[in-house]
Amino acid sequence: MTGMVYLIGAGPGDVKLITVKGRECIEKADVIVYDYLADAHLLEWARPDAELIYAGKQCKDHTMHQWEINELLVQKGKEGKIVARLKGGDPLVFGRGGEEAMALGEAGVPFEFVPGVTSPIAAPAYRSEEHTS
């Protein structure tokens, strides 16, 4: 039985900027693999029995290497788990979401991107600046 992996963008830092779909994925996940840049308050929406795995990376301080994260996502997906891969910002903007998707696709594990609000859009909006003027 194969599960499902959601590659979720948590937005630019304000927990209220995560998408409704992102929150729904967190709420139903069996496993949440989260990054350093994803606000820990988002984990409050996790089920009490959800497995929480920190996979944060900072400059020269990696809890897990990217290949280990890829393997973990594949493993949990193949175990039939619903996995929320929670990343700061958007998974496809410097989030290595493409690499994770490639590993999942090659392993035959279904996945879906859940885009996040990106900081290039959110930051000017907080300053009441138009993007297209």
Question: Where do the PLM segments sit?
Answer:
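Glycine-rich phosphate/diphosphate-binding loops that line cofactor/substrate pockets in enzymes
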Residues: 1, 46-47, 73-81
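Loop/turn-to-beta-strand initiation segments
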Residues: 5, 81-84
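Alpha-helical segments flanking ligand/cofactor-binding loops in enzyme cores
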Residues: 23-24, 74, 102
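Short gly/pro/ser/thr-enriched loop/turn and capping motifs at secondary-structure boundaries
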Residues: 40-41, 59-61, 118-122
